[in-house]
Amino acid sequence: MVLEKIQKENDIKKLTHKELELLKDEIRQFLIESISVTGGHLASNLGVVELTMALHLCFDLPKDKIVWDVGHQSYTHKILTGRKDGFSSLRQYGGMSGFPKTDESDCDCFNTGHSSTSISAGLGLATARQVTGEDYHVVSVIGDGALTGGMAYEALNNASSVKGNFIIVLNDNNMSISENVGGISQYLSGFRTADAYRDFKNNVMNSLNHIPIYGERMVKHIRNTKSSIKQLFIPGMFFEEMGIIYLGPVDGSDIKEMCRVFDEAKRVDGPVLVHVLTKKGAGYGPAERYPSRFHGAEPFVIETGLPKNKRTKANYTDVFSTVMKKLGERNPKVVAITAAMADGTGLRRFHCNFPDRFFDVGIAEAHATTFAAGLAKAGLIPVFAVYSSFLQRAFDQILHDVCIQNLHVIFAIDRAGLVGSDGETHQGIFDISYLSVIPNMTIMAPKNKWELSDMMKFAVAYDGPIALRYPRGTAYDGLKEIRQPVELAKSELIKKGSRVAIMALGSMVKTAVDAVKLLEAEGISATLINARFAMPFDKEAIKELPAEHSLLVTMEENVQSGGFGEHVTEYVKTNGIALEVLTVALPDCYVEHGNVEVLKKELHVDAESVAKRIIAAL
């Protein structure tokens, strides 16, 4: 196999043209076979095999720097830098990351995970080159979807300031930019290379300027009218107006043509954008037909593309989806917002039933938050469904635009807590900390799927900013018989005991139930309380505990600093309440990728670890 010849970076440059043709097919087959076992991002990676090969043929790694936006499409890059053997442990605890990692390889120049950051990072690397006097190329690879993120436009606006070569590769896998231009754009792409286009444009302007009397007037007229004409035919005029030379579109399956254009781009003294057309899922039928299903795929059967492990129970996203549909039916003021995650957040069903009340704002969490604030100000009830790690990007808007005005915006925070295989950039372990410091913000977390429904109903009836956080994965269906009405800042008693009281929040209630059973086996009868609210929490319930308890244990799936337990501890100490407080929370660190249950055990927040800590504290 040709693939066996790739042991380290730049080995691809030793291959013949025939071997390159074989290599791209072997890489695709390897990715399909490997990801069918481990799970991972398949569709996006199948779409950029040739593009990645062309980049590795034209640039020298690790000297040259390639920044992968989001980074989930970097699998071929990992293979071409000698990490093929790592795919057997892809996204598993202690194994290879599914994203670029600077501590994994010198060829990964910048860690990524979230969208729309690559151009900013690339500009920083290119500017540092100018300051230090070093000599290397910088390439930022960004998808057309990531260009909907405002940060990308901020960087594009700043790109013209860069001194020296800076290449942006637009990986367009939806053809949304080019479909309106047709054959004329293909014709123009033949001469819009760096040298040819720049020389052609300069020669025309110079010639016109030398025409007596009328020449200068003609140049001015051309400059005043060119954009309106070119916008009809040339897809890259948006970038050119920002001072970025545009090359393309280029066929993303043609390695030779991409290499030709990349070599031209390398000669540009300034920012240049290469527009490459790719196809998600290329080479694997199921992924081509249903690319969204193979975005972050679970292990699947290659012949059919169907998951190997069929789900028998609903996950929290499914439950939220069902509840949102019901809320939409009952209240015409309920509207839904997503930042390009309609399927991932479960809002697709709401979209299908209430298209006029559904808003996809693109990858723009900050905008989505202030947009929601505007909707709320006008009397609607906006529900912004968003992953915990992505809501971090909207902190200022939550504080400044929503909470200062005390607006009724509902934040449905999915993937709160440990998410597992996507690793440190996606773990939702900070939201309680960054939301609880904001005045007027209410934070809830359900113990099971029924409470999620009850809390959403409470949130719609509430008047003010409110967040509901729930984890990734199967919705807990235990404790169905305990379903007290949701009241602001009121907890729920699950089990009465003595000596030790456990106040668990959200997903940790299930862990607490298991820990209580382990304690009972040791002769310890613990009180178990479902906290429900992280902020404001149930102070009255805490005040009553010293009568029969000496130890209060708080449990949460959030970092300790600024978390639920820390706020409770401060309250107990400040008010002189006769309780020792043991905080069970995640450590104040970034948590790597891995199975959630494995991570909980390693981080000592599983039931067995909690029980041992309680016994030691008593």
Task: Show the residue positions of the predicted features.
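A glycine-rich helix N-cap at a beta->alpha junction
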Residues: 86-96, 161-175, 196, 403-415
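Peripheral docking tails and interdomain loops at the edges
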Residues: 299-303, 307-310, 420-422, 442, ...
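Structural signature of the thiamine diphosphate
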Residues: 218-286, 408-413, 432-481, 607-618
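Cofactor-binding active-site loop characterized by glycine-rich and histidine/acidic residues
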Residues: 24, 41-162, 316, 333-334, ...
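N-terminal amphipathic, basic-rich helices that act as targeting or association modules
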Residues: 1-80, 240, 244-246, 251-255, ...
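Non-catalytic terminal/interface segments that mediate subunit docking, oligomerization
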Residues: 65, 270, 278-392, 397-407, ...
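Long, well-ordered, tryptophan-enriched scaffold segments
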Residues: 174-320
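Glycine-/acidic-rich phosphate or pyrophosphate-binding loops and their flanking alpha/beta elements
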Residues: 260-263, 295-296, 305, 315-330, ...
